[in-house]
């Protein structure tokens, strides 16, 4: 499953919580239910657009989510491995960004967003990068365009490959490729058998 995770959007006034934090929390719960249904019921789908992903995660009866329900019969309702890939707009742990102390109210690092990531992982997903590199510091996948952040490696790790636990024995490696330019993000890589 790949999709764009909504950002909770930083506030206009410094020191306040992100503007869309409540929406982000609802979305996270719906997305967790959705990807667990993909795994548990063997539902086959790919979220091909932001709108389709939002509809699917929010439980919308039209569009992708409805198609997914129909596909469950074709898939036989058996368990299916799931990999979530992309920009999840959250740095899960303090180790996942350069300046955690000054960012606890920043979109992508609020306690609420980090807790939702913990809930997703505890529902049966593995953070593949941390599986192989539990203590590696200064490993980031996103840098602001401001203040020469990339050159100084003042970044956040917000791009992930999350895999269901049944894939863990097949994981070979997971990497971040910071030397590949092209945007404010760099590629992340997962090798699986």
What are the functions of these language-model segments?
Residues 1-193:
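Active-site regions of metal-assisted phosphoester/phosphodiester hydrolases
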């Amino acid at each position: 499953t790949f999709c764009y995770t909504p950002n909770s959007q930083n506030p206009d006034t410094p020191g306040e919580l992100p503007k869309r934090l409540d929406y982000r929390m609802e979305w996270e719960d719906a997305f967790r239910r959705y990807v667990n249904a993909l795994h548990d019921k063997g539902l086959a789908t790919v979220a091909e657009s932001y709108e389709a992903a939002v509809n699917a995660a929010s439980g919308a009866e039209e569009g992708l989510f409805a198609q997914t329900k129909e596909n469950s019969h074709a898939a036989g309702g058996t368990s299916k491995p799931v990999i979530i890939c992309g920009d999840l707009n959250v740095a899960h742990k303090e180790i996942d960004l350069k300046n955690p102390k000054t960012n606890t109210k920043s979109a992508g690092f609020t306690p609420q967003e980090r807790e939702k990531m913990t809930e997703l992982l505890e529902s049966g997903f593995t953070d593949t990068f941390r599986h192989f590199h539990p203590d590696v510091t200064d490993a980031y996948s996103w840098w602001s365009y401001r203040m020469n952040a990339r050159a100084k490696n003042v970044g956040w790790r917000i791009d992930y490959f999350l895999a269901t636990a049944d894939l863990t024995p097949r994981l070979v490696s997971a990497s971040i490729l910071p030397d590949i330019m092209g945007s404010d993000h760099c590629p992340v890589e997962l090798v699986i058998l």
